[in-house]
Amino acid sequence: MIEYADFECPYCARAHELMTGLAVRRLFRHFPVVSKHPRARVLAQAVEAAALQGAFWEMHDSLFEDQGRLDPPHLWERAKRLGLDLDRFEEDRRSEAVAERVERDFRSGIRAGVTTTPTLFVEGDAHPGVPTTELIDRLATARNGTL
């Protein structure tokens, strides 16, 4: 499954909640919709900076689970709580390499036809919006993490 999402999107947070605990292989792709969510790109870059210290999923989960606190002080608090080197985190977050990683994900979404977040691709089929009960059931019954 490939998931395109935006960390400020409330529908993405709901999708995250529904998919938590599913034993399916997930490829996450950043799709910051900055026209609606001005901090989305900064948050995506923070997740990629955390990834460089081995904490991608931890930062990812933290942002979706508490969208009410996405401002810089809370972002640093999260990084500290995850045990990240804060100087390195900040340097990486502002780096060209991290910005390019986020932009590459976004461009891949455009090429794939993503127009809204979240959008899931399961077995090549696009599923825009919050996943349906049927899709969640299908993902929940996947064997060995694959469909």
Sequence positions of predicted segments:
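Structural alpha/beta surface segment adjacent to cysteine/selenocysteine redox centers
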Residues: 2-80, 90, 147
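C-terminal cap of thioredoxin/glutaredoxin-like
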Residues: 3-5, 11, 16-21, 77-147
